[in-house]
A protein has these predicted regions:
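Conserved, well-structured core segments that form or line functional sites
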Residues: 2-236
Length: 236
């Protein structure tokens, strides 16, 4: 993908809330290369974002997104998606792990960017300890390659120590969060269908996954149940 598609800007350095005012489809590619830090009593962990997905909900322009949690109505679960832009939406996925989203669009309009994958840039030992703690006992002693510590949304949330109870609805511009834009625009961005999303929402009609090509931390593409067939868009 060439720079300029999907409204990619040259915003670098520190972010402010206006960065998240556009909808998720505009913001998702701009987050590639940004660095997110999450502090805790154990210490901070930072991750450089290498893969994102956009989800569009109530009040947004464009096609109806059947893959979005906020596609039909506001609920207790998705309430954070309707907050001011620049807040965290953390949910529990498949009864197994947490996933982190950044809230976009003006208040009351629901869109969010799923932070799918990243590369840990500091706090590696703490991220590793958290990942190993979450592993089943039979795998606990097997080493985890550093490039895989935050590969996939569940692993990323675990490495950063995120939970719904502690982090859902928090402001990304206040502790324990800190976020900084990429120091320079990416040389290239790839796009394709979203990973593991069922039905038409996981097909080529919704090429709303964005990633940095050549990054080993990026997920391998896996189609969702009953998703329309498309050429694999695994990271290259």
């Amino acid at each position: 993908m060439r720079q300029g598609q999907f409204g990619f800007s040259r915003h670098t350095g520190d972010m402010d809330r206006t960065f998240f005012l556009p909808d998720a489809l505009s913001v998702a590619p701009q987050l590639l290369g940004a660095v997110l830090t999450v502090d805790s009593a154990e210490g901070p962990v930072s991750v450089r974002i290498t893969e994102t997905e956009a989800y569009m909900g109530l009040g947004t322009n464009g096609p109806y997104d059947p893959g979005s949690h906020s596609k039909d109505r506001k609920t207790e679960r998705n309430a954070s998606m309707f907050l001011d832009p620049g807040h965290a939406y953390v949910y529990f996925s498949y009864g197994m792990h947490y996933a982190l989203n950044f809230v976009c669009s003006p208040p009351g309009i629901a869109s969010g960017v799923l932070i799918r994958s990243g590369a840990i840039t500091s706090g590696t030992e703490l991220a590793m300890a958290r990942r190993l703690e979450k592993r089943p006992a039979r795998y606990a002693r097997n080493p985890i390659p550093e490039v895989q510590l935050a590969r996939g949304p569940g692993n990323l949330a675990a490495a950063l120590g995120l939970t719904r109870l502690a982090h859902d609805g928090l402001d990304l511009f206040s502790p324990p969060f800190a976020i900084h834009a990429a120091p320079s625009p990416p040389a290239a961005i790839r796009t394709g269908p979203r990973v593991g999303v069922a039905g038409i929402a996981g097909g080529p009609q919704f090429p709303w996954r964005f990633w940095l090509p050549g990054e080993p931390s990026v997920s391998t593409f896996r189609p969702g149940r009953d998703a329309p067939a498309s050429r694999s868009n695994a990271a290259e």
